[in-house]
Amino acid sequence: MTTPANPRLPIHAAHGTELTARSWQTEAPLRMLMNNLDPENAERPEDLVVYGGTGRAARSWEAYDALVRTLTTLGDDETMLVQSGKPVGVMRTHEWAPRVLIANSNLVGDWANWEEFRRLEDLGLTMYGQMTAGSWIYIGTQGILQGTFETFAAVADKRFGGTLAGTITVTAGLGGMGGAQPLAVTMNDGVVICVECDPERIRRRIDHRYLDVEAPSLEAAVALAVEARDERRPLSIGLLGNAAEVLPRILETEVPVDIVTDQTSAHDPLYYLPVGVPFEEWAARREADPEGFTKEARASMAAHVRAMVELQDRGAEVFDYGNSIRDEARKGGYDRAFEFPGFVPAYIRPLFCEGKGPFRWAALSGDPADIAATDRAILELFPANERLRKWITMAGERVHFQGLPARICWLGYGERHLAGLRFNEMVASGELKAPIVIGRDHLDCGSVASPYRETEGMLDGSDAIADWAVLNALVNTASGASWVSFHHGGGVGIGRSLHAGQVCVADGTDLAAQKIERVLTNDPGMGVIRHVDAGYDRAAEVARERGVRIPMSEG
């Protein structure tokens, strides 16, 4: 018996200026919810899965219908409450309150593990929201691209004289997050071999111009990589295979590998393909015996990470890109799993101390010309930032839009609100055809507690203190964000993180300008405060220089 076709599919966000909802403040979350499920963005839209294994935009199709229905009728003095992808209430609030408040995947500590989460998910009581899937601000692979670009640029600065030209990177995973890796490396002038077990993902990354070529074998991939490296020519190479098998083989070839990382879905062992399991049998095998499958996956991750550590022993720069593969490998029996660092303490924390982090926006008009106009505005606002200029220029030339046209760049405390206010002015003046939504990843300087990623190795040992993520959600709600979310388990998996997100709508009104100024000042301000409190001197300098009040420093 065949499953009947879902009449809702395919889903595309509306373009243009005609409203379905009662105002732009509610039209925006409606369009962004739909944009998350656009087939250009979503990995499995038929299952409401956007990215990251099982990261969903809504809990069920019935819940999706109720979300759409409620957003179209919601007033500007009302707030919709969303509990793990399902609308559970509408409250009368006020125009400064968020139109949507979202809580996804949150569990009490002793119950915060994958087994209990899956039991509750099977009962229809929760869903996995990842970071931007359940908070409706996913913009495709570009959403992680600049962060990945910045990370590889930091690697280049640290080890390779400011460029990756003449280097070879080996990594794995070309999904919604990992798919940014090949372009991020080539934007830094390097060569990269990307291992992926799903042929469709390789094809998609080539179609979207994130990946240059596919090699038919490891030997062919190595030959292409060495040739490009010797010519100091950027090149990204996709290789169909299982990383737990390919990386040990790379060790045997003794190819001089310079950089190693990974972005497979290791955060959830059911979405890491074990050695010996055919790709075609993956789904059936994990559903038939999740406990046994998890054990096999962890054993394969142990082999994968062992190869990474041995490449580090040979001199490669190796780092965890925030998917918990080290912890899973340790559970799989490999004791040296944590001998290489996570990317945040290794490269990104100095940026966090300045309140820098991912600042993204999408054009509700659907017109790429609106993004081109905002690109120009960003360059005019920050003419002295050479790395930003390089990024915006290359992104305009090379980044494929997925769904609504969007852009991302990293901005710091004292910068984000200037960009938001400029965009709002451009909407008001008619320079932009429709409003802009402004949000970010939950991976930010002051919005997450994640001891295996963003808060790994904090100076004061506060890696697991989650108060900061809660305060971030509260301050963004108090400051006037259009929608605010608080999630558990994004990026690194259930039991390992708590994190918050916010989105503002620049609709050209004076009220929007007031909200934007507060939110886009206070949100990155939380990053400065969090790092001052942890004892980082640079954060304390930024606080003094830019007027961030720290009561414990005022006595």
UniProtKB/Swiss-Prot annotation:
This is Urocanate hydratase. It is found in: Cytoplasm. GO terms for biological process: L-histidine catabolic process to glutamate and formamide; L-histidine catabolic process to glutamate and formate. It catalyses: 4-imidazolone-5-propanoate = trans-urocanate + H2O. InterPro entries: Urocanase (IPR055351), Urocanase-like (IPR023637), Urocanase_C (IPR035401), Urocanase_central_sf (IPR038364), Urocanase_CS (IPR023636), Urocanase_N (IPR035400), Urocanase_Rossmann-like (IPR035085), Urocanase_sf (IPR036190). It comes from the Bacteria. Catalyzes the conversion of urocanate to 4-imidazolone-5-propionate. Its EC number is 4.2.1.49. The active site is at C409. One of its GO terms (molecular function) is urocanate hydratase activity. NAD(+) binds at residues 52-53, 130, 176-178, 196, 201, 242-243, 263-267, 272-273, 321, 491. It holds the Pfam family Urocanase. Keywords: Cytoplasm, Histidine metabolism, Lyase, NAD. Binds 1 NAD(+) per subunit. Gene3D superfamilies: Urocanase like domains, Urocanase superfamily. It comes from Nocardioides sp. (strain ATCC BAA-499 / JS614). Pathway: Amino-acid degradation; L-histidine degradation into L-glutamate; N-formimidoyl-L-glutamate from L-histidine: step 2/3. Its cofactor is NAD(+). Belongs to the urocanase family. GO terms for cellular component: cytoplasm.
